[in-house]
Amino acid sequence: MNLDDWLAHCERLHPVAIDMGLARVQAVADRLALKFEGPVITVAGTNGKGSTCAMLEAILSEAGYRTGVYTSPHLVHFEERCRVAGEIVEPEALVPHFERVAQAREDVSLTYFEFTTLAILSLLADKQLDVVILEVGLGGRLDAVNIIDSDCAIVTSVDLDHMAYLGNDRETIGREKAGIFRTGRPAIVSDPVPPQSVLDRAVEIGADLWRMGHDFNYAGDKQQWSWSGRGRRYSGLAYPALRGANQLMN
């Protein structure tokens, strides 16, 4: 089977496209014994996830780190969801990992997103990466990506999205996204006016909360920008290649 065959197979496995919960995907992940050598950064949020992942990848790569990135959805080809050392992986490289997931799942039913997420995580775990960057697909708390205990969690923004699955207001949705936070680890919130539920979750579990406008901030003019936070300041920074007024916030 090639990658297209596996993707078609994944579409037929589960009775519904979205099935919130981690029990099934966690059971298969345990059988796969997924383990990353370096730190993992997980990014959630209504908007800005993809841009944040791209800029993290660029910064870390420029600093000499070997990166792995998982984002979704893709624009044209499925393999766009996975990059290693800045390059999109070849379709053929993913096939053995789809086979691994198929063997590990046995009788466990997985959605398309759960199956494909596990396959990409399996590939990234085999690549001896310095840093792994994971983009949440939907929400955070019950997203398949959240089976990985990340070393740093980022919530870019919280707005009304996927309300049928995440809730009808920012407070409820915010708590879902804050589900990626971990005790004692950095939890970065770049929404300038985050829901109280996001802040409460960080305090509740003892995460190291970094809040825009409190723990860090930025300023810019027509030619350059600066960042400051917790006793550090970086000035004279060049604007990112990604254009838009919101990109400095990302």
Features from the language model and the residues they span:
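N-terminal leader/targeting and accessory segments in enzymes
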Residues: 1-47, 51-66, 75-76, 92, ...
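ATP-dependent carboxylate-amine ligase catalytic core
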Residues: 16-18, 22-37, 62-148, 164-166, ...
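Acidic, Mg2+-coordinating active-site environments of NTP-dependent enzymes
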Residues: 128-135, 150-241
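Short glycine/threonine-rich catalytic loop with a Thr-x-Gly-x-Asp
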Residues: 67, 242-250
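A short glycine/serine-rich beta->alpha loop
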Residues: 105-110, 239-245
